[in-house]
Amino acid sequence: MRCLLILIAVTAAIAGSFAYLSLDLGQLFSMDAAAGMLRFMLTFFPPELSSAFLAKTAVGMLETLAVSAVGTLCAAVLGFGLALPASGLYGDALRAFSRLLLNLLRSIPELVWAALTVLAVGLGPFAGTLALALHTAGVLGRLFAEALENAPRAPARALADAGTPAALVFVYGTLPCVWPQFLAYILYRWENNIRVAAILGFVGAGGLGQMLYFELSLFHLSQACTVIIAMLALAAMVDTASAILRVDRHSQ
């Protein structure tokens, strides 16, 4: 009964959204719309393949990759630090405060964080790195906290009963149980962040996104096509690398 009520509520919300926005699906999927979209896409070709622009694009790819990697790493460290009290290890008061902080961090989208960090530290990749780190810390911190709360208690309890210090109980009793989950969460967020990092450039956070915004603003469509292809290639490479790392982890 509960599932039926949820299904009815979701269906009503979707139907109400279509009615409120007055969407005309007939125009969206019409032949004229498809032909217009195709003509627009063809204006981007052929891509710009001059050596100077390809070198510039390669630098943008490296910058975007660095922003996503460093941002994810900083987020993992900050998220782990907040996940410890959020999991209830240090009492209910710190648990409530940490969860509130994690909710705040992840409820603000990356683009909003980027707009704020650009105002704080100026244009460039540092602003993008901070934006990714702050939002992703909220996401990873909550996931880490849930993993810690659901970790098996038996190994930690056995070490504690043997007189092991609390820090070592956590390191040798709890952390090995949740580390595979932590690594999986970090890799998945890195996959997501490589795409987000490419978009953050639209608000001045550096990388391929900033290049794309610049080229589109000048209607350099061939150059924009090259940047878009670089974005797709970078995302595919990161997805492949992440998949290989996960396979290696499972095979060990």
Predicted regions and their residues:
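N-terminal, non-cleaved signal-anchor transmembrane helix
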Residues: M1-L73, G81, P85, A93, ...
